[in-house]
Amino acid sequence: FYTYAFGKLTNGFLSDRANIAKFMSTGLGVSAVMNLFFGVTSVFWIFGILWAINGWFQSMGSAPAVVSVTQWFSSKERGTYYGIWAASHNIGEGLTFIGTASIVALFGWQAGFIVPGVICFIVAIILLFSLQDRPETYGLPNVSEYKGEVSTKKKAKKSIKDFQLDVLKSPIVIKIGLSATFLYTVRYAIHS
């Protein structure tokens, strides 16, 4: 849980600079491998180490998804597509509970890790070859320019790093972060 939380913080910054397809597929691929290992070990301390590694790499999923939505859709479209993404995340989680419970009931607890691990590894490979990085990577214009949403304001002189530091210092971001911490604590307590 803690490596996942810390990973969401740091991987959010890294995904701003990384190739989205490589970043997201690496996170999912390593998480898939960790799930395969979960299915073949029953040693508690090994399981704990694998769980921490898994948490870190799972945290590489949401940030690049948000970056991708931001890079490929205009400000007028983002709310719709972000809403679809958020809904699919929750629907997928619910279906995962049902699917994994069925797999465990039919084939045992190890299969509850191995089968999803194999599926996620296949999806990671598909993502690597199908998820597109930023439009500029392919010689396309920025989506804001393409959609005619270019701001008339002067370009900011701050670097991405400076903007990120400003965000971290923002009282509202700190409040939202604390709220999310408590929300996730309750969410995981309910799941358990």
Report residues per predicted region.
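Residue-level signature of mid-helix packing/kink "hotspots" within the transmembrane helices
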Residues: F1-L9, E93-G94
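Helix-breaking motifs and short loop linkers at transmembrane-helix boundaries and internal kinks
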Residues: N19, V40-W45
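Structural signature of the two symmetry-related core transmembrane helices
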Residues: K22-L36
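Short hydrophobic/alpha-helical segments at membrane-entry points of transmembrane helices
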Residues: W45-W51, K175-I176
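Cytoplasmic helix-loop-helix junction between adjacent transmembrane helices
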Residues: L50-I91
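Helix-loop-helix hairpin linking two adjacent transmembrane segments in secondary transporters
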Residues: W85-P135
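Juxtamembrane intracellular "pre-TM" segments in multi-pass secondary transporters
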Residues: Y138-K175
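Extracytoplasmic gate region of multi-pass secondary transporters
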Residues: S170-S192
